[in-house]
Design a protein with these regions (language model features):
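Accessory RNA-recognition modules of RNA-modification enzymes
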Residues: 1-153, 158-234, 241-242, 247, ...
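Flexible, glycine-/basic-rich loop-and-beta segments that form/coincide
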Residues: 305-306
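Short glycine-rich anion-binding loops that position phosphate/pyrophosphate groups of nucleotides
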Residues: 237-239, 264
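C-terminal substrate-binding/active-site "lid" region of AdoMet-derived donor-dependent transferases
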Residues: 247-251, 255-301
């Protein structure tokens, strides 16, 4: 992108000396400003400021260890009413590389969740598995409900408000990377969401579900507030969720599953497992988030008959 090239030029990256086989990574979130002139290099560098990271062999050489990202989400699917969510992401951690990917994926996933929920808003519970820094978690908690005044929900640009007549969805998020969970908790707190609404757990997804949900005391907070999801969103790594997690989702009683996948082979295997567990595919959409490569991002909606 122009932002990456502008920062690379400003750092004189092309004329630096590096050791042989050095791993060099330059991460530069692009400014999210409507009508911004990316051809104005001085204005671009000013807008970027210190929001970039040059990492060489996993060591921060220049910029910031914590990067700021911004995602706009359509309120109740209405693109004329947009909400903005801000995220802190570790420069060494994972974030979608395509600049438009987070926004497209969040809006599409939220649309599927709303569809799966139908008219139900009361006591809605959602799971966000392999949740990273909270890309889906925060919008799910504030915008998943199809009733009530979601436009006044907490989280837009750090402001707070009320959820109108509808209780916000309760979201259980689970992520294995400690630094991603740390960022997620920071982002959740900045959005003004309490732990009664969103609980972010750290650990292997299968093991955490087993210990915190299925084998935990019925009196535990996790079991009381989060154990029975209406919809499960999962965005596993390339290896996929695998059979144990698929079976745990089915055991939870979730009536719908939104599966975000970066590897079609793993997705096909896991969809086969879900089908054996009584789920059927309702929709499948592919996103070309890796132009000029053979990679593709896929989002599948599956539902289970009552």
């Amino acid at each position: 992108s122009r932002a990456v090239l502008a920062v690379a030029d400003s750092l004189d990256l092309w004329n630096r000396s590096f050791s042989p086989n050095a791993q060099i990574r330059l991460a530069v979130p692009e400014p999210r400003v409507d009508g911004f002139d990316f051809n104005d290099k001085a204005a671009l560098l000013s807008a970027i400021g210190e929001n970039y990271a040059l990492i060489v062999n996993d060591e921060l050489v220049a910029g910031s260890a914590l990067l700021s990202e911004r995602v706009r989400v359509a309120v109740d699917g209405d693109s004329s009413r947009m909400r903005t969510f801000d995220y802190d992401v570790d420069a060494r951690g994972f974030w979608q590389i395509h600049r438009a990917a987070p926004e497209h994926l969040v809006n599409y996933v939220l649309g599927l969740v709303r569809s799966a929920l139908g008219g139900r808003t009361k006591n809605t519970v959602l799971w966000d598995l392999y949740s990273g820094s909270g890309l889906f978690t925060i919008p799910l908690a504030t915008l998943a409900n199809v009733g009530g005044d979601s436009s006044s929900a907490v989280g837009a640009l750090g402001t707070t408000g009320t959820f109108g007549s509808a209780e916000p969805a309760r979201v259980l998020s689970i992520e294995g990377a400690p630094i991603a969970v740390k960022n997620a908790r920071r982002n959740i707190g900045r959005a003004g969401l309490s732990r009664d609404i969103v609980e972010a757990l750290e650990g292997d997804v299968a093991q955490t579900l087993e210990s915190q949900v299925f084998k935990a005391s019925k009196s535990s907070k996790i079991v009381r507030r989060f154990a029975h999801p209406d919809v499960v969103v999962l965005d596993p790594p390339r290896a996929g969720a695998k059979a144990q997690v698929c079976k745990q989702i089915a055991k939870s009683g979730a009536r719908a599953v939104v599966y975000v996948a970066c590897d079609p082979t793993s997705l096909a295997r896991d969809v086969g497992t879900f089908r054996e567990l009584g789920y059927s595919v309702q929709s499948l959409r592919a996103f070309d988030l890796y132009p000029e490569t053979h990679h593709v991002e896929s989002v599948v909606l599956m539902s289970k008959a009552d």
